């Protein structure tokens, strides 16, 4: 649902929304999103390595299996590009990420670093921010 509640700068999306993930990612739930519609556009999953271009990615999902060091490398590579970066690794916001997916054993929830989102010139809907467990704005 992050794709539905994110606004990208003009000219950064084409006729589809591209959700990128690292090639080593085994988070199979992402495959179920492929072909779904978000913001009236089909969603395509693209598996990439750090050597691949991220220019057509609107969202980059980094699985916890990447580990903190590798995730820091990805975040450096992305910089302030208008790409929403999401991960399920503990401490993702402290690493410099935008949205951290969390599971406390009973519930799934998420936390947002709004300052990082804004640095990338992205906007998240008020609806999405209201249901976040934590919103950091530094």
Regions found by a protein language model. Give the residues of each.
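Short hydrophobic alpha-helices and adjacent helix-cap/hinge residues
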Residues: 2-138
